[in-house]
Amino acid sequence: MKELILKGERAKEASYVLMNATTSEKNDALIKMGQKLLENKEYIIAENKKDLENAMLKGTSKAMLDRLYLDEKRLEDMADGLNQLVNLNDPIGEVITMWKRPNGLQIGKQRVPMGVIGIIYEARPNVTCDAAGLCLKAGNAVILRGGSEAINSNKAIVKALCEGIKESGLPEYSLQLIENTSREIANEMMRLNEYIDVLIPRGGAGLIQAVVKNATVPVIETGVGNCHVYVDEEADFKMAEDIIINAKTSRPAVCNAEEKLLVNEKIAEEFLPKIISALREKNVEVRGDSSVMKIVDDVKEATDEDWGKEYLDFIIGIKIVNNIDEAIKHINKYGSGHSEAIITNNYQNSQKFLQRVDAAAVYVNASTRFTDGCEFGFGAEIGISTQKLHARGPMGLNELTTTKYIIYGNGQIR
């Protein structure tokens, strides 16, 4: 606990410097962080190899190994991500709106940093770099607690990034990593209200639920993605197949991957054999309801548990629905509020789906894989918020700020 309190104190001190840092000072730090990342790439890759070897010994799935894996190209992408942040507008100090009251007071609403952000995440070392860069650009100090699976990678990345921050003249404690990966330390971090202003968990359902349940620090819930694609009776089959294959197989272990497929009963007999064959060619295990099993052989029966499960693997659950209303009802019951899609050429059905599905991102005729800060034009993101308070959807720089009111007067009293 002493180590945590020390990190909290240092982060709080750093946050007071960062909140007043100029855009050029922050951008200089980001550039130097990217440079140090590449200068240390051989060391980082060697440390990442240790994590990969440990993960393989534990029987980690291929999809999860892909999340953990770093090579020169991925490190270059991470450094490029830091440089892209340099080109994004600095939200700090922006006056969102201003108005004048009848008594002459001028009242404005201005963006300011959150302060100290805590991030608890799993085996994705790229998150270490993304989080550090985003928090710094938005004027926040950050305390990271990554998973044990990526501890060697994270230590190496943070060491390099901190060298860049220190060289720029900003406080080196703007970025800190908790190297103790025990659950007890994570629980203590969740209750560090005196120092941490907001906590953001990134990972699977178990991690996020544990943080939401145990934290006394305010939490922005992110990431669990039980995403659906509904194929309407008026869908273009070729478009539907392309979208489903992309959404399921391009990167199955990410939160915006498709997990469930809903098919209108009027097209099921024609469409299901085609799409299941295409999925199997990509080595996807298909689980279906009893209606699906009657149409296609060798489909594993889906259980009630399947409908609410995020697989993060080459597995998909398929259900036949009577109509769009049943599809929407199913999605709102079992979905995680992340990303949902409809494939249809019917305008009325597309609008009904957009209006009635309760999710952060709702698509018409496009893959759920686009729910991403860069794809939305925000630059990198800290995560995908699935809650409704403060932020919803991809969380870019603006979502890492809060606001304060600034009031100009000329002697008014009340």
Swiss-Prot record:
Subcellular location: Cytoplasm
Keyword Ribonucleoprotein applies: no
Pathway recorded for this protein: Amino-acid biosynthesis; L-proline biosynthesis; L-glutamate 5-semialdehyde from L-glutamate: step 2/2
Keywords attached to this entry: Amino-acid biosynthesis, Cytoplasm, NADP, Oxidoreductase, Proline biosynthesis
Name of the top EC class for this enzyme: oxidoreductase
PROSITE patterns per the UniProt record, alphabetical: PROA
EC numbers: 1.2.1.41
Pfam family, one: Aldedh
Enzymatic reactions: L-glutamate 5-semialdehyde + phosphate + NADP(+) = L-glutamyl 5-phosphate + NADPH + H(+)
UniProt xrefs under HAMAP family: ProA
Function as written in the Swiss-Prot or TrEMBL entry: Catalyzes the NADPH-dependent reduction of L-glutamate 5-phosphate into L-glutamate 5-semialdehyde and phosphate. The product spontaneously undergoes cyclization to form 1-pyrroline-5-carboxylate.
Protein's UniProt name: Gamma-glutamyl phosphate reductase
Organism: Clostridium botulinum (strain Eklund 17B / Type B)
